[in-house]
């Protein structure tokens, strides 16, 4: 049929062309292909990187962002392109998905960022190709475990103040590093576990002979000493078990746990031996029961992270271990049967039955080869060789899976420990930096006041006290200094050199600046006496600085007559009005604080021009009843006491 169409079609076209000269009207135009007209080349701009593709390529998946009309919201009319402020590296994989229909996961990308990009473009991660899906799931699981560990640690730290006594005890047992007492108990129990295991081993060692009897082990020759050691160990284990049982969140689940069973098995032989009689039959059963004391070694799993990781590995590899056991059982039965019939005709053969051949098959498949049972016939030797080779294959196949799981769990624990250590170190560095920054600023401020005093007195230690710090630290100190001058409050911590004591003020707070400078001046004059001037208050330039927002003006609080409920909701600095002595008042917007001063109005430490900062700090009354307003604060002066200083406090971070 196709050959026939191909044969007559050229003739039909030639006939149509031949009739055109005698046609009365032009030939109709061919119908336009709508799909071809709509298939235009579009440009996708992703964070400056331009991608080009066909529109029909994107419309293959209309349920996604690029395949639907929602992408028109991102169309830029000026550049005639679609702009997306997203990651261009991940978009390359997204665009390849539209082209090929296969979504791949780049191993160098963060799993959380990759999921966010897929969610933005409306692509489900379940359609990732088989070549990358396992890698994606592993990274997803590791990230989920990491986030879970972080959330657990944060929740534990946040819920610490509200823990009950039982919860505190259980937390101390599970994490001994939470307190010193828990850490001491942790090491004491570990020491007695080691003593118990060593005692159980040493008591079987021969310790010489007694006249008229055979050689005695150390456990019988020094029975009192070993009994005392065993009693001390069992008492410690019993107390630990009872405390854990008392502090357990769910006692039923604790009793059913593996570690609880190990604890009971480790201490029960001692108590059973105390109530047993000297009957030989009962004593034989007691000797058999004493074998369970060796299970005390499993108590080390609480003290060893490696043993816990091994337990988690065996638990996670239960299916692989089950497959290994099933394969070995099948191979043992098959080769034991073959070896029995192969050696059946041999004289003095040790393969007397199929169960007796199990021993040879197990030893051969595990490549031990004790040599107590060996085949005599040619067929037996051939099947024995096949049994040995098959054992190597059966055992070696699940081993890499177990090793990979152990490595994965081990590295997860290592990363979790490293994250916790880094978080603890980061918090410690932040605390040290905050303290150091605060102390450095106060030290530089005190040195600045002392330098001004030494400049007037002419003390030769001016050069020593005028040391400069780094540029960043100087800018930080200048920022805090300007904040002090703007708000009219002073940054203060407990300082033994100052006569002002901050017993009623918390550390790292802003208090009245005039009181702070006055005490600094008094302290500086006490430490550096001068005969030139008994008082520094007569010098006008002593208390002036390079900042134009210098002096303070006492005004009544504009919101002091508001109700107490209104005052409670206004806890922050409301407005800062900056006024010059001869300049018009500025606006209260934020930009007014960043205006650059004119050259003619450049602040001068020697001039008397002063900028007044009026501060409105509505604070709720602390000691007045509801509905009463606090009276306006008094003007700060030399006689201002500490309670008046602490009345208006603005807390500012040292960093």
From Swiss-Prot:
InterPro entries (UniProt xref): BTB/POZ_dom (IPR000210), Ion_trans_dom (IPR005821), K_chnl_volt-dep_Kv (IPR003968), K_chnl_volt-dep_Kv4 (IPR003975), K_chnl_volt-dep_Kv4.3 (IPR004056), K_chnl_volt-dep_Kv4_C (IPR024587), Shal-type_N (IPR021645), SKP1/BTB/POZ_sf (IPR011333)
Motif (Selectivity filter): 367-372
Protein residues bound to K(+): 367-370
Annotated segments matching region Interaction with KCNIP1: 70-78
Region annotation Disordered: where it falls in the sequence: 525-565, 615-655
Main location: membrane
Superkingdom per UniProt: Eukaryota
Clinical condition linked: Spinocerebellar ataxia 19: A form of spinocerebellar ataxia, a clinically and genetically heterogeneous group of cerebellar disorders. Patients show progressive incoordination of gait and often poor coordination of hands, speech and eye movements, due to degeneration of the cerebellum with variable involvement of the brainstem and spinal cord. SCA19 is a relatively mild, cerebellar ataxic syndrome with cognitive impairment, pyramidal tract involvement, tremor and peripheral neuropathy, and mild atrophy of the cerebellar hemispheres and vermis. Brugada syndrome 9: A tachyarrhythmia characterized by right bundle branch block and ST segment elevation on an electrocardiogram (ECG). It can cause the ventricles to beat so fast that the blood is prevented from circulating efficiently in the body. When this situation occurs, the individual will faint and may die in a few minutes if the heart is not reset.
Intramembrane parts of the chain: 353-366, 367-374
Annotated function: Pore-forming (alpha) subunit of voltage-gated A-type potassium channels that mediates transmembrane potassium transport in excitable membranes, in brain and heart. In cardiomyocytes, may generate the transient outward potassium current I(To). In neurons, may conduct the transient subthreshold somatodendritic A-type potassium current (ISA). Kinetics properties are characterized by fast activation at subthreshold membrane potentials, rapid inactivation, and quick recovery from inactivation. Channel properties are modulated by interactions with regulatory subunits.
Protein name as annotated: A-type voltage-gated potassium channel KCND3
Tissue distribution of the protein: Highly expressed in heart and brain, in particular in cortex, cerebellum, amygdala and caudate nucleus. Detected at lower levels in liver, skeletal muscle, kidney and pancreas.
GO molecular function: A-type (transient outward) potassium channel activity; metal ion binding; voltage-gated potassium channel activity involved in cardiac muscle cell action potential repolarization
CC terms in the record's Gene Ontology section: dendritic spine; GABA-ergic synapse; Kv4.3-KChIP1 channel complex; neuronal cell body; plasma membrane; postsynaptic membrane; postsynaptic specialization membrane; sarcolemma
Positions on the Extracellular side per record topology: 205-223, 278-283, 344-352
Sites where the protein binds Zn(2+): 104, 110, 131-132
Region (Mediates dendritic targeting): 472-487
Catalytic activity: K(+)(in) = K(+)(out)
Family label: Belongs to the potassium channel family. D (Shal) (TC 1.A.1.2) subfamily. Kv4.3/KCND3 sub-subfamily.
Span list, region Interaction with KCNIP1 and KCNIP2: 6-21, 470-487
């Amino acid at each position: 049929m196709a050959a026939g169409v191909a044969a007559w079609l050229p003739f039909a076209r030639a006939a149509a062309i031949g009739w055109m000269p005698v046609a009365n009207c032009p030939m109709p135009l061919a119908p336009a292909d709508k799909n071809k007209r709509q298939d235009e080349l579009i440009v996708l701009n992703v964070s400056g990187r331009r991608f080009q593709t066909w529109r029909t390529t994107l419309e293959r998946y209309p349920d996604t962002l690029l395949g639907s009309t929602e992408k028109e919201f991102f169309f830029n009319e000026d550049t005639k392109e679609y702009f997306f402020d997203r990651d261009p590296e991940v978009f390359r994989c997204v665009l390849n998905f539209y082209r090929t229909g296969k979504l791949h996961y780049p191993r160098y990308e963060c799993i959380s960022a990759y999921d966010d990009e897929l969610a933005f473009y409306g692509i489900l991660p379940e359609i990732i190709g088989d070549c990358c899906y396992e890698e994606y799931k592993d990274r997803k699981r590791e990230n989920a475990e990491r986030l879970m560990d972080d959330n657990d640690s944060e929740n534990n730290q946040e819920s610490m103040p509200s823990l009950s006594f039982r919860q505190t005890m259980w937390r101390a047992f599970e994490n001994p590093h939470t307190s010193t007492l828990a850490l001491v108990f942790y090491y004491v129990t570990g020491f007695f576990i080691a003593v118990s295991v060593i005692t159980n081993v040493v008591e079987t060692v021969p310790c010489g002979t007694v006249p008229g009897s055979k050689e005695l082990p150390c456990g019988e020759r020094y029975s009192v000493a070993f009994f005392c050691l065993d009693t001390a160990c069992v008492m410690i284990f019993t107390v630990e078990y009872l405390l854990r049982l008392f502090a357990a969140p769910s006692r039923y689940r604790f009793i059913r746990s593996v570690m609880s069973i190990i604890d009971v098995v480790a201490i029960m032989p001692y108590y059973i031996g105390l109530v047993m009689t000297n009957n030989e039959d009962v004593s034989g059963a007691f000797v058999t029961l004493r074998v369970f004391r060796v299970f005390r070694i499993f108590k080390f799993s609480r003290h060893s992270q490696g043993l816990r990781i091994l337990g988690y590995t065996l638990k996670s590899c239960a299916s692989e271990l089950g497959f290994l056991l099933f394969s070995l059982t099948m191979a043992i039965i098959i080769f034991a049967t073959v070896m029995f019939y192969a050696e059946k005709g041999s004289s003095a053969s040790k393969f007397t039955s199929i169960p007796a051949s199990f021993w040879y098959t197990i030893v051969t498949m595990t490549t031990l080869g004790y040599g107590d049972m060996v085949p005599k016939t040619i067929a037996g030797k051939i099947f024995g060789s096949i049994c040995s080779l098959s054992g190597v294959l059966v055992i070696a196949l699940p081993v890499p899976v177990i090793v990979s799981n152990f490595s994965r769990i081990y590295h997860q624990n290592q990363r979790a420990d490293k994250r916790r250590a880094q978080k603890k170190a980061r918090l410690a560095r932040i605390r040290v930096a905050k303290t150091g920054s605060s102390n450095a600023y106060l030290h530089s401020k005190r040195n600045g006041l002392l330098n001004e005093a030494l400049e007037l007195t002419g003390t030769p230690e001016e050069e020593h006290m005028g040391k400069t710090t780094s540029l960043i630290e100087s800018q930080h100190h200048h920022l805090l200094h300007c904040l002090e001058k703007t708000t009219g409050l002073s940054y203060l911590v407990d300082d033994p050199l100052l006569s002002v004591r901050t017993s009623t003020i918390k550390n790292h707070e802003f208090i009245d600046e005039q009181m702070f400078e006055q005490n600094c001046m008094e302290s500086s004059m006490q430490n550096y006496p001068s005969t030139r001037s008994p008082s520094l208050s007569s010098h006008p330039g002593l208390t002036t600085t390079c900042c134009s927002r210098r002096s303070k003006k006492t005004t009544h609080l504009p919101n002091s007559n508001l109700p107490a409920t209104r005052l409670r909701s206004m806890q922050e600095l409301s407005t800062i009005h900056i006024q010059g002595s001869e300049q018009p008042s500025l606006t209260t917007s934020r930009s007014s604080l960043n205006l650059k001063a004119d050259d003619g109005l450049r602040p001068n430490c020697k001039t008397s021009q002063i900028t007044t900062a009026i501060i409105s700090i509505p604070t709720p009354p602390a000691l007045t009843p509801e509905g009463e307003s606090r009276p306006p604060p008094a003007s700060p002066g030399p006689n201002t006491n500490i309670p008046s200083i602490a009345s208006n406090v603005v807390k500012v971070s040292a960093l």
